[in-house]
Structure formats: structure tokens, C-alpha cells
């Protein structure tokens, strides 16, 4: 019951804020919005982007549909993908999500497994976990304790910064197993996850398990 009261203190203000924003929303036409193309968009292998990430050094990383992983330093775009010149770099060139761990390594998911890129030599290695090598990675997040969370195929996995798996979780919402579509760490270093078809969960570090919370 104490946990339920605590979550109420967190979730209720958020709901009220969302309702307030919705009620007081100003029509989009009231804003002066300017949309510009990416400065180096002509250097991208494809115009279809699946995700965008800015690393700790300020560089932009783009995950593309079929074009691999792209790093933009503001002047040039470097592309990492498998092609006839560099076969075997990636099993699949569609990059679905990107994050950065505490050591500065870039982690990224594809439609066939996850990879780790070292920014010192740009070497890419596949995550050595046979379980997820053929699965589409839906989302990933690096948290402050050095954990990398990866969601795929209705499973949530936990890894350390060396790429070793340290946990596997199946989250059920109303009796159904669903894929996690977002992972968030709050200011208190608490990890929250949501599922595609409903479901809000909080990670309990002591019990190494997820607690389900009420959701409409």
C-alpha cells in the first residue's frame, strides 16, 4: 500500500499536467514554426530515419531504414553499414534505436540484433547474446548505474557495459505479454517502462523485478 501511495504522488501530478496542457492547448497555427532540412542530409545514405541520438560529445547519430548507422559531426557524415565493400559489419542495415553507455560507447539496435561501437577506433561488434541476434530491437536505454536495458520480442534484457547479460524479464499487463516500447530513468534513478498495448512498470532493484502499476 505504501508503494501505491508513492506512485499516486508521482503519477497524479503528471496526469493533471497533461490534462492542463490539453485544455489550454493553443492551435498549432498560433506558433511561428520553421522546419529546415538537416544540414548534411544530402550525405545520408537514405532519407528515411528511424531514430536520432545526440551523444555526450555533441555528435548526432542517425538510425536509418536500410542505410545503416550514421554519425554527423556537423561537417561530414560517416556511415556504418554492410555493403559490397564492407560485408558482414551488420546483419541488418535498419537501425531502430541508439544509446550511449557511461564509457562513451555507442550501442544501437537493428532489425536483427544489437551492436556496440567504440568511438576510439570505430570498431563494431555484435552483442554476444545468441538469444536476441535474430530479433528486432525495439528500444534501448543506458542508465546511470552502468546498465543498458534492451527491449525485443516481448522480452526486456539487462546488460552491463561489457555487453554481458545480467537479467531477463517478461512483463505482463492484464495477463498479456507485450513488448516494452519506452524505458526511462527518473531523477531518483528509478527505471520506468511502458508497453505498446498498455502497461506501466517500475524496476525494484532490491528484488530485481518489475512492479506493475495501475494504468487506464
Residue ranges and their predicted role:
Residues 1-216:
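Carboxylate-rich, polar loop motifs that coordinate divalent cations or form catalytic acidic clusters
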Amino acid at each position: 500500500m505504501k508503494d501505491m501511495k508513492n506512485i499516486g504522488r508521482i503519477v497524479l501530478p503528471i496526469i493533471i499536467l497533461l490534462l492542463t496542457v490539453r485544455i489550454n492547448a493553443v492551435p498549432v497555427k498560433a506558433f511561428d514554426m520553421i522546419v529546415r532540412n538537416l544540414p548534411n542530409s544530402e550525405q545520408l545514405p537514405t532519407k528515411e530515419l528511424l531514430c536520432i541520438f545526440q551523444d555526450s560529445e555533441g555528435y548526432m547519430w542517425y538510425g536509418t531504414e536500410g542505410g545503416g548507422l550514421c554519425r554527423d559531426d556537423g561537417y561530414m557524415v560517416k556511415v556504418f553499414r554492410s555493403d559490397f565493400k564492407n560485408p558482414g559489419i551488420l546483419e541488418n542495415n535498419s537501425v531502430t534505436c541508439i544509446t550511449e553507455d557511461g564509457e562513451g560507447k555507442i550501442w544501437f539496435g537493428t532489425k536483427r540484433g544489437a551492436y556496440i561501437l567504440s568511438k576510439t577506433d570505430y570498431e563494431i561488434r555484435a552483442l554476444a547474446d545468441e538469444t536476441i541476434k535474430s530479433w528486432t530491437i525495439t528500444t534501448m536505454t543506458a542508465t546511470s548505474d552502468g546498465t543498458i536495458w534492451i527491449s525485443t520480442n516481448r522480452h526486456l534484457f539487462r546488460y552491463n557495459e561489457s555487453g554481458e547479460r545480467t537479467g531477463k524479464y517478461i512483463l505482463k499487463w492484464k495477463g498479456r505479454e507485450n513488448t516494452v516500447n519506452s524505458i526511462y530513468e527518473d531523477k531518483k534513478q528509478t527505471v520506468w517502462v511502458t508497453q505498446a498495448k498498455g502497461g506501466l512498470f517500475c524496476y525494484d532493484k532490491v528484488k530485481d523485478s518489475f512492479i506493475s502499476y495501475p494504468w487506464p
